[in-house]
């Protein structure tokens, strides 16, 4: 790797041993993937995927102490992934003891570290940092040092920024150093598509299900999706951005997608079209039957597959303001149709703190809470990591949460039926 004189000086210890180790780590990372040089991080803000103070990760927090003691705060302010704990989310006494006395014993320490390292605000914890209410929205062409897979794939695909699927800690090191190795999705060639995905469904495909199918098929490759504009149109409005948020999260978690192109819709697909397809690309055709096949393939790992749901999570990734309002309208109509006032299953909707602040005082906010829905800022995955919570019959509309936990996936329509106890559910 060819370093600039300034970068070489940092590696040689010009700003101390700790900074030299940060740069050495980035150099080794780049060498692993064949990077020839470093490129500056150009986004206004960073984002860190580690937002939880797990006891087993104490060495990580010890390393962060060393960074702070060496004066190496982030070169850019940053947001962070969602917090793991919220007293409003249902837990038993024993579950709460496990959360606070066994699992997340480093939480207070870590949140104080993030303040010293440069987090933007006390409420800057969300996986959807790119939403307007949060304010960490990169521009097309910006070079990022992020790691959260759902945020990386959104920034690359919907915003046209450039970021690799980095690991936790490495992304913060990129923000501290101010540069990252250039390879993969930071390059023009690395952003070309290996797959042409033709969507031939007779109705708008469920975002989380379509993303799952594509992710499992292409894995870490870049897909170019054709035919989705039939259902979404050609404008990146609020509804479509929310759809692509959920779609992308499923591609990234059910596979390892860091970038997708949607013909006639996403920025680079609009600008370059079929030129994004690399020579020798493969084709994957998705129709209604293929989506149903994928859905049927999901394992049910509950101890009792016929158990009644005990808890429902909606919002992985975090919901947008528009999605909260849409869910409120759907639940209102569905409950009225069943002559019910409240949801039949304890239900938690998760969103960024700033989004929740904007929603709670609206008419829809009062309505949703009156229906028994709990609004929270947590990461559902962090909740499900509790071994006692894993034993619960938890349902979700998130394919990411299904993939990483014991939660059982249902489509939005199926979730509505379960929450309102529609006949047959």
Protein language model regions, located:
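Non-transmembrane, aqueous-exposed alpha-helical and coiled segments at domain scale
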Residues: 1-425
């Amino acid at each position: 790797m060819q370093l600039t004189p300034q970068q070489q000086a940092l590696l040689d210890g010009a700003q101390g041993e700790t900074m030299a180790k940060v740069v050495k780590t980035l150099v080794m990372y780049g060498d692993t993937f064949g990077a020839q040089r470093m490129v500056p991080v150009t986004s206004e803000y960073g984002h860190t995927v580690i937002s939880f103070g797990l006891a087993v990760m104490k060495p990580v927090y010890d390393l962060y102490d060393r960074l702070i003691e060496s004066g190496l705060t982030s070169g850019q302010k940053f947001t962070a992934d969602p917090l793991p704990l919220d007293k409003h989310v249902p837990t038993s006494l024993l579950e709460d003891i496990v959360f606070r006395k066994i699992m997340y014993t480093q939480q207070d320490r870590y949140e104080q570290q993030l303040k010293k390292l440069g987090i933007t605000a006390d409420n800057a914890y969300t996986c959807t940092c790119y939403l307007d209410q949060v304010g960490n929205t990169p521009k097309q062409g910006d070079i990022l040092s992020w790691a959260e897979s759902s945020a990386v794939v959104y920034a690359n695909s919907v915003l046209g920024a450039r970021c690799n699927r980095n690991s936790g800690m490495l992304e913060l090191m990129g923000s501290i150093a101010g540069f990252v190795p250039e390879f993969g999705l930071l390059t023009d060639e690395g952003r070309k598509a290996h797959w042409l995905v033709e969507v031939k469904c007779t109705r708008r495909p469920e975002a989380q299900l379509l993303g799952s199918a594509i992710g499992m098929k292409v894995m870490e490759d870049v897909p170019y999706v054709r035919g989705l504009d039939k259902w979404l149109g050609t404008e990146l409005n609020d509804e479509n951005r929310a759809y692509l948020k959920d779609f992308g999260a499923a591609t990234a978690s059910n596979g390892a997608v860091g970038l997708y192109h949607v013909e006639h819709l996403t920025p680079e697909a609009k600008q370059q079209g079929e030129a994004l397809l690399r020579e020798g690309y493969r084709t994957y055709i998705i129709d209604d039957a293929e989506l149903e096949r994928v859905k049927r393939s999901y394992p049910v790992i509950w101890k009792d597959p016929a158990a009644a749901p005990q808890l429902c999570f909606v919002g992985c990734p975090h919901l947008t303001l528009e999605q909260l309002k849409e869910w409120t309208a759907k639940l209102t109509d569905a409950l009225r149709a069943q002559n019910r006032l409240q949801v039949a299953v304890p239900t938690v909707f998760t969103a960024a703190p700033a989004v929740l602040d904007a929603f709670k005082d609206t008419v829809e906010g009062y309505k949703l809470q009156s229906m028994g829905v709990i609004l929270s800022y947590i990461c559902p995955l962090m909740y499900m990591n509790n071994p006692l919570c894993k034993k619960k019959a938890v349902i979700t509309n998130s394919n990411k949460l299904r993939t990483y936990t014991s939660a059982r996936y249902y489509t939005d329509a199926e979730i509505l039926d379960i929450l309102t106890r529609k006949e047959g559910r």
